[in-house]
């Protein structure tokens, strides 16, 4: 996924709510920016952190600036919570994910039961539902999800178990929005119930995968599969 809009650089000042923050541009101007991620991201959004903003100057926006990337030390992290779905969908269509090659129909945002899953794959009578979770939390080289309790995430896992029970394929992909990660594990400290449901789901045949990303200042591409440690 490549950002084609202009980008500008700045330093993070403070987050004022789930969707907005203040950033000082390299020009010295202090401005409001939209934060396209409702997660806490406390270890990323620290005063003085270098950030990259995408300029989306469309009518009706409160601010033209979208907080797209942030540096955590030397590690560049993609912030936008819409990116993981785009990257995974693009990668499946291009045949880059070995586990999901060979499907004839690739659809996004399809409903099953009480949930809407990110991707539905079809090959003849074979159906696979895929849920994508973006991961921005890194602790000592280990990626963790979630960074805050997620009722929605727990619900998706329960529904994936139902998909599997009905004889279809069910999978969750944790798309780690950065590189140089040792492995992925559920964040039991923040949401022990999510970890419990993930382990239960995998035990009942739901597939769990984690991939890192090659992240640049205007692009995010799928990179390497890493181990899911439960």
From Swiss-Prot:
Gene3D superfamilies associated with the record: 2.40.50.580, 3.40.1350.60
Highest rank taxon of the organism: Bacteria
One Pfam family in the UniProt entry: SfsA
Signal peptide range: none
Molecular function GO terms recorded: DNA binding
Family: Belongs to the SfsA family.
Annotated PANTHER family: SUGAR FERMENTATION STIMULATION PROTEIN A
Name the UniProt record assigns to this protein: Sugar fermentation stimulation protein homolog
Organism whose genome encodes this protein: Thermoanaerobacter pseudethanolicus (strain ATCC 33223 / 39E)
């Amino acid at each position: 996924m490549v950002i084609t809009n202009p980008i500008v650089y700045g330093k993070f000042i403070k987050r004022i709510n789930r969707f907005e923050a203040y950033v000082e541009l390299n020009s010295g101007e202090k401005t409001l920016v939209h934060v396209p991620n409702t997660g806490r991201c406390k270890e990323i959004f620290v005063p003085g952190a270098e950030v990259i903003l995408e300029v989306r100057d469309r009518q009706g926006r409160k601010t033209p600036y979208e907080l797209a990337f942030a540096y955590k030390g030397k590690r560049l992290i993609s912030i936008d919570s819409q990116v993981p779905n785009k990257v995974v969908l693009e990668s499946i269509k291009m045949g880059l994910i070995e586990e999901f090659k060979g499907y004839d129909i690739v659809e996004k945002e399809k409903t099953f039961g009480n949930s809407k899953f990110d991707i539905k794959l079809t090959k003849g009578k074979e159906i696979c539902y895929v849920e994508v979770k973006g991961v921005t939390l890194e602790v000592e080289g280990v990626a963790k999800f979630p960074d805050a309790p997620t009722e929605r995430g727990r619900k998706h896992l329960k529904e994936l178990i139902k998909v599997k029970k009905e004889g279809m394929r069910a999978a969750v992909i944790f798309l780690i929005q950065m590189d140089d990660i040792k492995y992925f594990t559920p964040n039991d400290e923040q949401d022990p119930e999510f970890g419990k449901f993930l382990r239960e789901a995998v035990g009942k045949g739901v597939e769990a995968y984690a991939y890192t990303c090659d992240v640049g200042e205007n692009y995010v591409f799928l990179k390497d599969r890493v181990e899911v440690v439960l």
